[in-house]
Amino acid sequence: MRSGVIAQKLGMTRVFTDAGEHIPVTVLKLDGCQVVGHRTKEQNGYVAVQLGIGRAKVKNVSKAERGRFAVAKVEPKLKLAEFRVDDATLLPIGAEITADHFVVGQFVDVTGTSTGKGFAGAMKRWNFGGLRATHGVSISHRSHGSTGGRQDPGKTFKNKKMAGHLGTERVTTLNLRVVQTDVERGLILVEGAVPGTAGGWIYVRDAVKKHLPKEAPLPGKFRLANEGAEPAPATESAEG
């Protein structure tokens, strides 16, 4: 089981095939997605990699987090997430995952936070049909109607579909096909829509209901930081 990645949704566009057909795609960007920590069976009871993405200002990072980034020798990150892996696919700390971690044609599962739409009625939130236009109905054409029984059961059951807040929920979309990858710019183009708004964080994993292509690199595609690179600002802040 390989590690997933954290990506930032940039928006949607389309790409054309050789036959002239266009494919709607969502553009996901890997902005310095690095391994910042490990979870091991001996210490934590499970095996996982902790990834970070983005560039956070040192003043906005807590002292404990600055120390964590200093140990990993990476700059402070905006977003952190864990991905369960096997012992054989545990990536080294400091490794930066590149866009060709996923191969063209493979299927991925994406997870994000859906767009918030505020308070919504039952017709928009649950696709209710609404009440009749005439025949005694007035004012309440878009209402949800009855919510329960009479004296028995004498209550409205929990989880009844009613008006309320719509969106801002964790949503996973399965089996989206990778159309293109751009290693230099760190872009992954997946076919179809991805949950969330532009600028939101998206978790991308190998599809659990599809076979992993033989071309997919194991344990993953990444590049290591330069041995002679200068220490990150987080190191100085942690020591101070």
From Swiss-Prot:
Q: List the disulfide bonds.
A: none
| Molecular function GO labels | rRNA binding; structural constituent of ribosome
Which of UniProt's keywords are assigned here? Answer: Methylation, Ribonucleoprotein, Ribosomal protein, RNA-binding, rRNA-binding
Reply yes or no: does the keyword Ribosomal protein apply: yes
Positions of modified residues (N5-methylglutamine): 151
Q: What's the PTM story here?
A: Methylated by PrmB.
Q: Supply the SUPFAM superfamilies for this chain.
A: Translation proteins
Cellular component, GO, one term = cytosolic large ribosomal subunit
Q: Which Pfam families match?
A: Ribosomal_L3
Any one GO BP annotation for this protein? translation
Domain of life, source organism: Bacteria
Region feature Disordered, mapped onto this chain: 138-158, 215-240
Q: How does it assemble?
A: Part of the 50S ribosomal subunit. Forms a cluster with proteins L14 and L19.
Write down the NCBIfam families for this protein, in alphabetical order: L3_bact
Of which family is this protein a member? Belongs to the universal ribosomal protein uL3 family.
HAMAP family named among the record's database cross-references: Ribosomal_uL3_B
Function of the protein? One of the primary rRNA binding proteins, it binds directly near the 3'-end of the 23S rRNA, where it nucleates assembly of the 50S subunit.
Protein name, please? Large ribosomal subunit protein uL3
Q: Which gene encodes it?
A: rplC
